[in-house]
Structures are given as structure tokens and as C-alpha cells.
Amino acid sequence: MIRPGRCLWQPCLSGRKRSRPSGPVSRHGMMAAMTAPTAAAIRPVQALLVVDVQAAFVSGWEAVPDADRVLRCTRDLLSRARAAGALVVHLQNDGEPGAVDAPHTPGWELHLPVEPGPRERVVRKTEDDGFADTPLGDLLTDAGVTELAVCGVLSEMCVAATARTALVRGHRVVLPHDAHATYDIPAAPGISDTVPAAMSSRAAEWALGDEVEIVPHAAAVPFAAAPRPAVGPAAAPGLPVSPAAPPPSPVR
């Protein structure tokens, strides 16, 4: 089974490692540490990256199992980010021809409306990593953004790849546990039974290491105004205005 579209995970080693316990830890304690989202005082963030919230992944029969929850949490994040004057960037994946998210097909369309203005942008991409061959890095730099939140789909693919690169670039990254999702991992004979989507999402969080701030609920993420407006033309509703990413390579 291949997940819809071309949002394929490309691991990137950032050098960040999960710290080991300094003393003996019971099996129960270790499992609790691995399954409970990190809770800490949360400082406001200046930007929201909405990753691949496109029709193919959050609506219809191919939607991720937790699409309703992700959409509800993303709407809340968007509303509060806009009200605070934070930079909002919608990442839109350009799938390969024939994929459910191939450009200009119904599944490719952004599911949530884009509001025109100096602090909202759409960035198209052809890789998991929203920074790869896109203007995302320049947008954040030009707006003076140092702290950001990430939400969307798929947890272990485009969400993780984008969050990881943001960390490598020196950004503070907040990842709300209830604002990202993925698909079940199908059973593999001799390897594992089906892995539920929720477990896959949690494993994706854990794999990002210690520096990402994972919070249980999107509602707890506060926003502040971006220091400067984004440079370049403002987004019209539903229309990407960033330079289109290059066409996908036919060979992967």
C-alpha cells in the first residue's frame, strides 16, 4: 500500500538525539515517557505552518482517520494566528501526475480558505520538506520569524520533514499533538501487524528529538505578531502566489 500522493518521507539526520535517563527507569516509566506528550510553559510563536491540508488528505474516502480532529484544531490555530498578526504559511504539495494531489486536480486544492493579506502566504512544494527548493525559508527570514508552530498531514512524512528542517535552521518549533495526523501503517508479513495511525503520529513526534516542543492541545499554543509582514504579493483566496516548485522528477 502506498499513501496517496507523493508525500514520501525522506529521513534527515539533524544530530539531535533523545536524551537517555540518568538513572534506572522501570518499564512502566519508560513507556509513560514515550507515550505522554511533553508539557511545558509555552511561549508565543510568530508563525503557523499548515502542512498539506489538501482535499485528498482530509476529505472523502482517502482522508486520514483523524481528519475531523485535525481540521478542527487547524481552524482554531488559524483563527488565533490571524488575530494575533502571526505569519501564516499554507504548504501545498504538488503530487506526481496521476496522484490524488496532482496539481490542479480536486484533491490538490487547499481544504481551508486562504485569507488575503500581508501575513498569509501559500507555498507549493514537490518534496516532503517544505523548505526544499521553495521560498519558505526566505519568507520566515524576511518576516523576522524565529518561533513557529507546525500542523497538518502526514505526521511522519511532510510534517516531520518540515519541522526537522525548521529545527536545523535554528527556529523554535512547537508541534501540537492533536493538530497533525497520518494513515494506519499496513501489516507487513513477518514484520508487524497493522500500526494504528495514532501510534505512527506519536512515533513521528518522538523521532524529532528533544528540541521540538510537543504540546497536547492546539488550543494551548499562543501566538504573537510576526515582527514584519511577509515580502512579496499577498495571497488571494485559494491561489498560490509563491513561485511554483519545479515539476517532480520522473525518477525517485
Curated annotation (Swiss-Prot):
Enzyme Commission identifier(s): 3.5.2.19
Gene Ontology terms describing biological process: response to antibiotic
pH dependence: Optimum pH is 7.0.
Record-linked InterPro entries: Isochorismatase-like_dom, Isochorismatase-like_hydrls, Isochorismatase-like_sf
Location of the region described as Disordered in the Swiss-Prot/TrEMBL record: 230-252
GO MF terms, alphabetically ordered: hydrolase activity, acting on carbon-nitrogen (but not peptide) bonds, in cyclic amides
Hydrolase found in the keyword field: yes
UniProt effect for mutating C158S: Loss of activity
Classification via PANTHER family: ISOCHORISMATASE HYDROLASE (PTHR43540:SF1), PEROXYUREIDOACRYLATE/UREIDOACRYLATE AMIDOHYDROLASE-RELATED (PTHR43540)
Family assignment from sequence similarity: Belongs to the isochorismatase family.
Protein's recorded name: Streptothricin hydrolase
Upper lineage: Bacteria, Bacillati, Actinomycetota, Actinomycetes, Kitasatosporales
Gene name of the record: sttH
